[in-house]
């Protein structure tokens, strides 16, 4: 049975375009997979703590099996989020682009799930760090909305897009390399122009729902 983990990063709730597009995909996908499990994790309207000193000390404790109870508590949410990632086959991330990057809640989620010894490993080869991803066989779909035009591949503003390219990098680092991005652009442009972009994104998501 397929299991999909949906990460919603917009703080706007029902007014969010990226969230609505992602839910359009989910609805179509569930029609084709009625027995599948869908888990929604809210990171835009719920607080995901930023990494702090206590988290770093606990995450890099030299003997993970012997962590004190206080350190285990510092990593409890992170352990839960990592467990969710391993427990699902498919990852769906809906996010707007804010100031050229992702919202802080999504950044915090990524920081919580990129964990040494859990989602990636680290060794030294002649003193040079070598990294090994520990997630395998998973796919991801990123659904994003952008205020302007031209932030996609080949676009005039592509170099300013540090949102979905950064997500690709972070996901690839832990082993999720099969990543598809669907974007709606132009919310700050004319209403009709944005509507066309949204319609195109919706159609692509409906097509993906048949194959994802």
Swiss-Prot record:
Annotated GO MF terms: electron transfer activity; FMN binding; oxidoreductase activity, acting on NAD(P)H as acceptor; oxidoreductase activity, acting on NAD(P)H, quinone or similar compound as acceptor
Keywords: Flavoprotein, FMN, NAD, Oxidoreductase
Catalytic activities: 2 a quinone + NADH + H(+) = 2 a 1,4-benzosemiquinone + NAD(+); N,N-dimethyl-1,4-phenylenediamine + anthranilate + 2 NAD(+) = 2-(4-dimethylaminophenyl)diazenylbenzoate + 2 NADH + 2 H(+)
Enzyme Commission number(s): 1.6.5.-, 1.7.1.17
Gene3D superfamilies: 3.40.50.360
Pfam families hit by this protein: Flavodoxin_2 (PF02525)
Cofactor note: Binds 1 FMN per subunit.
Top-level EC class as recorded in UniProt: oxidoreductase
Cofactor annotation: FMN
Top-rank taxon, per record: Bacteria
Keyword rRNA-binding: no
Chain positions recorded as FMN binding sites: 10, 16-18, 97-100, 145-148
Annotated family: Belongs to the azoreductase type 1 family.
Subunit structure: Homodimer.
Function per UniProt: Quinone reductase that provides resistance to thiol-specific stress caused by electrophilic quinones.
Protein name: FMN-dependent NADH:quinone oxidoreductase 1
Organism, as annotated: Pseudomonas fluorescens (strain Pf0-1)
Taxonomic classification: Bacteria, Pseudomonadati, Pseudomonadota, Gammaproteobacteria, Pseudomonadales
Name of the encoding gene: azoR1
């Amino acid at each position: 049975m397929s299991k999909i983990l949906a990460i919603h990063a917009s703080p706007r709730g029902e007014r969010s375009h990226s969230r609505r597009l992602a839910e359009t995909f989910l609805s179509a996908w569930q029609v084709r997979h009625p027995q599948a499990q869908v888990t929604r994790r809210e990171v835009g309207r719920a607080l995901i703590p930023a990494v702090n000193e206590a988290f770093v000390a606990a995450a890099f404790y030299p003997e993970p099996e012997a962590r004190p109870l206080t350190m285990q508590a510092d990593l409890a949410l992170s352990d839960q989020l990592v467990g969710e990632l391993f427990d699902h086959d498919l990852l769906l991330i809906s996010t707007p682009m804010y100031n050229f990057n992702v919202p802080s809640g999504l950044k915090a989620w990524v920081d919580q799930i990129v964990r040494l010894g859990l989602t990636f490993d680290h060794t030294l080869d002649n003193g040079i760090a070598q990294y090994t991803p520990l997630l395998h066989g998973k796919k991801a779909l990123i659904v994003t909305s952008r205020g302007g035009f031209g932030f996609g591949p080949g676009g005039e503003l592509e170099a300013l897009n540090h949102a979905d390219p950064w997500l690709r990098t972070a996901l690839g680092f832990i082993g999720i390399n099969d990543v598809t991005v669907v974007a709606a652009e132009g919310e700050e442009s004319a209403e009709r122009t944005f509507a066309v972009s949204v319609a195109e994104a919706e159609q692509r998501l409906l097509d993906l729902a048949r194959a994802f």
